[in-house]
Amino acid sequence: MKKFKIRKLMARVLALALVFSTFFMVSKVDANAASYNLMETYGAKYGYSGNCVHTHMLRDSRIVNAIKKDSNIVTLGNEMKPDYLLGSRQATLISVDEAKRLGYYIPSNYKERYVPKIDFRTVDEAVKICYENGLKMRGHTLVWHSQTPTWLFRENYSGNGRFVNTATMDARLEFYVKSVMGHFYSGKYGSTLVYWDVCNETLHAQNSGWEAVYGSNKTNAVYVKKAFNYAYQVLEQYKLTNSVKLFYNDYNTYMEVNDVIKLVNYINQGKKVCAGVGMQSHLGTGFPSVDYYTNALNSFLRAGFEVQITELDITNKGDYDLNNYAYRLFKNINAAKKNGGNISCITWWGPSDAETWIRNEKPLIWSNIGVAKPAYDEVVKAFTETFGNPGSFTPQPTITPQPTPTPSGQT
C-alpha cells in the first residue's frame, strides 16, 4: 500500500515537473521570439524601419511612443499630397509678390500674376512632432495623378479652364516642387525629411492632367524627369545631396519591372537624380508569390537602384496564412540584403489592423497599436536566422540632413 502511494506521488511529481518544464520551454521560446523589436533588427541593419501615420495619431504621445519601438521614420498617409496642401475644390490664389514674401519659389519663367496658396499648417505640425521625437519622415508625394486638384493643370487655376501649355505647366511644376521642399529645408525642422517620393504611380496614370498637358509616354514621361531635376536642385541649394534621397514610387512593380527600370534610367539620363525605387508592397498571400516579388526586388538591385519597401501590408486568410507568408517573404528580403543588396528602408502601411486602409483584412503585424501579432515574431525570426541576434552584426549608420542654403537663394 505504501509502495503504491509512493509511486502515485512520484507520478504526480513527474507529471507536474513535465508541465512546468513544458511551460518554461514555451515561455522561453515566446520570450526569445518577442525579445527583439523591429528597431533592434531591421532598423539597425537596414537603416530605417518605418510606418504610415496621420497627424492626429502623432498628437497622442502614447501612440508616438508605441510607434517609436518599431520605427525611426514615418510616412504621412495623406497630409503631404497635393490635394491636402493646395485644396482640392478650388484654388486660393495669392499674388506673386505675396508668395515671395511667404518664401515661395517663383521661377524666372513664371508668367502668371497669381499662384495657389499652399497650406502647410497640418504638415508643419506633424514634422515638428517627429523632430521632437527623433523620428525622420518620408515626403509623400510631390507629383501624382491622383489626389491632385484638376485646376492645377488649367488656365487661371480654374476647374473650368482649358489645359495650359507645357511651358506654363513647367513653371507651375517648378514653383510647386521647390516651394514645398524649400519650405521645410529653410525651416527649423528640415532635418526631419530624409527621403522623397518625388513621383508616384506614373506608370498607372490614366486620363490625368499630367497626360493632358505632356502626353502619355509613361517610360519617358517628360514631367517626371523635370520634377526630379527640380527636386534635386533644391537638394543642391541646401547642400543635401549626400543626405537626402529622391525616389520613384509605384505599386505592382513586380508586374512592370522592365518599365520601372526604363523610367528610372530615363530620369537619370545626363545626371543621376533618382536614387532608386520605392516598391509599394500591397501584397496578398495568394498573389504575388514570394518568389515573384523577390525576383523583382533583385532585378531592381541588379539594375543598380537603391530599393525601399514603402507601403507594406499583406491581405491573408488568417494568422497561420499570414505567419507563413511573412516569414518566407522576409527570409527572401533578408537574403537579398545579406548578399549586398542596397535596401535601406522597410515601411509598413499602418501601425495596426485597426488603422489600415484595407478594411476587414487584418493585413498588418499588429492587431492594435503596440500589440504584436504572431506574424511579428515570424518577421523577427526571419531576421535573426539570417543575420543573428542584435549585437552580432554592425548597425547601418544613418545621416541626419543639415540644410545649409547656398547664396543662390530664391528668385
Curated annotation (Swiss-Prot):
Pathway: Glycan degradation; xylan degradation. Residues 387-411 are annotated as: Disordered. Residues 398-411 have a biased composition (Pro residues). Its EC number is 3.2.1.8. Keywords: Carbohydrate metabolism, Glycosidase, Hydrolase, Polysaccharide degradation, Signal, Xylan degradation. It catalyses: Endohydrolysis of (1->4)-beta-D-xylosidic linkages in xylans. Residues 34-382 form the GH10 domain. It is an enzyme of class 3 (hydrolase). One of its GO terms (biological process) is xylan catabolic process. Residues 1-33 form the signal peptide. One of its GO terms (molecular function) is endo-1,4-beta-xylanase activity. The active site is at residues 201, 311. B.fibrisolvens is located in the rumen of ruminant animals, where it contributes to the animal's digestion of plant material by hydrolyzing hemicellulose with its xylanases. Belongs to the glycosyl hydrolase 10 (cellulase F) family. This is Endo-1,4-beta-xylanase A.
